[in-house]
Amino acid sequence: ERRCMINIQIFLYTYHTRIDEIFSSFCTSIYNLEGKCSMISKNVFKTLGMIMFTGASSVAFSSANVSKLSTVWDKTFSKSDKVSYEKVAYSNRYGIKIVADLYTPKNMDKSNKYPAIVVGPPYGGVKEQGAGIYAQTMAERGFVALAFDPSYNGESGGEPRHVSSPDIFVEDFSAAVDFLGLQSYVDREKIGVIGICGSGGFALTATQANQRIKAVATLSMYDISRQKRMGLYDSLSDKDRKNYLEQISKQRWEDAENGTPKLTPQFPNQPLEKIPDGLDPITSEFFEYYTTKRGFHPRSIGAFTISSEMDFINFPLMNYLDTISPRPILFVVGENAHSRYFSEDAYKKAAEPKELYVVKGARHIDLYDRVDLIPFDKLEKFFNENLK
């Protein structure tokens, strides 16, 4: 049953017929359970299919939506009176326009040079959520900080919408370093990065090669390539992976015929008053953040093109963590985070200097926005000591 729950999301990405027929096929052909999954799991599956995910759909946002940048404060957090804020745009090396929020200390003397930090959002998130909280708070503490929307997502450009790519998402960190290094008030020798959730893996991978990044911190890090290839807790068998890849491969033909890539199921397009009953703990946790007023944002739909899955299965992230040394790495993880093993395993592979910092009582999503739990003093000290 646990394995059944862990892989429901993967299954939902590839099958889009009637829920009852899907579940029977899922249990019999993929897991050989012959209808023995519990009624609890079946109900959860139906809940995921009908409530959490509104069904796989075609690409949701056009380029016209991307070009109309909002000028109002539309964040999930309050605006600080201790910082200055502006929306900026620049291009990555693929020519994709990246839209970002730039936070600087209030009344900053631009004739001086300041340390700078790039902040990447959780996988499927946007700059108006957790990444913005980190950027604004670090600006309050004296850093120039940039929170960006990844390529193809949020307000950033790129067609088709909601593509997910290990290469390009890593490149987005380097493009942010490009932008910051062109600002007269940024010290090019004092640029660090913060990656939250999936961006933690992208940030580490960018740092492996990009020598301009002098220090890197991750919060609730997710290794998206490992999760896609192996399933959560490495539960996906070789047979299951092959079946999954066959479905994704065929999806490319369907996308080519339609001229529009199909998306994985997405979150509701309006905030929910309460978390649906019957969800497994991991799904319920993500619902708590992304689908309620706590973290809901209309541009954070939690979906990507189905064909994007193939690249993450094919191209692993963080293969050369030891090469980041002698630049320092700080892994921050919640004591009760379901994703904790990603950071622990990456920590083992990394070379010194490195630190694994565990936040007592914190779950995975709590390090997105719980300012009472996020160790900002620790982050400030880490970057002050290493961006010098």
Where are the regions that the model predicts?
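Alpha/beta-hydrolase-fold enzymes
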Residues: L204-F287
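N-terminal cap/lid segment of alpha/beta-hydrolase-fold proteins
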Residues: L69-N112
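Short beta-strand element of the alpha/beta-hydrolase
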Residues: N112-P122
